[in-house]
């Protein structure tokens, strides 16, 4: 008997698969392969097996998907089994697929979806993918990227490597346009030919402010989980997923610097996720523009949808971002882990903002320069180098920043550079807080008074005033701890000024 079913799919271990290498071509290739399987090939496969009219795609992006299927349960089971094998074959064993389904009815959509997700979770926990060492011997060559068993030689650019089948497939997809295609088409409409960088080194060479400096920008949606749980119908879910996916893609394309040799490459784009590796001087402006455009676009798309407009209070959805700065030779794994940590910090700040609502959290941005410290974890760097304890606790930064504050600190950093204040004086200003509260104040005043031009002094004073700092400290009374917190914007400001063109 043919019934209606809701089918949910999920690809576990995406981060390990996509970001488990330090080669740009493999990272973007793995991401493109996953995106192609997820957004296009899964729906085509299901329709070919079960019939065009028997498959309705609710959404399929970001490593997950949801479909409404009309079929006999035995046919659905057989199709799901074949689909899992299809994912393994297409990725050469690099990806696996989890599926769950339940009988579907429009009246009980959310309950049916919960049952399908429960079945998917059950499959995941009962059949875990347990990593194990592969066979190694002195006469077997290891893969140069993942240490698996190499199967063939592969060339990209001037480099030749011995790779396993999984990594070869990543490289082959990395040679294609992949996620770059939509951005290239967007640029072509503007009469621009977008030239993609071939490796991390080339991205660093395109940094105009400080050569070889790069950044990894990682963004994720705020309060999305709560909003998804409030959805009651299939149509609402479809509207929501399409609006989010389209908005994050459009925001990314419009925010990227679109001129000639693009100093960036898109590593992850879909659902509410965004990751771009780019030159250090373009990262902060890109993050600001992407966050602002995403909120504007979702607000516009939901304006005609009473359900979402009511839940969001007429506002749009938001994303928070983490920016890990480094050099082109900084191991990607370090920049990735730091961007994840910074993203969590931003999302936490948004969830604690006084302007947050039940389904809304303001966008925040956090950033860190990995090459300035020895610690891998951002929290360790800040605890070791950016906290003073004399005689009371002093924090030498104000990160993360809300979107208005992030825009303000960028503008003031530009003003410092445009005022032609000598670079050595700016560096000394940035180091002043590290001297302690009293000596730091004296050093800051000395440098301020020693700045001869009135316009330059005004730029320094305006920047400190905007963030409530008095040469250079800001004291905030913490009522919960019954103590005074001392912070400064000066360190953050000078760090950011170092990446202004």
Stretches with model-predicted labels:
Residues 1-501:
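Regulatory and interdomain segments flanking nucleotide-handling catalytic cores
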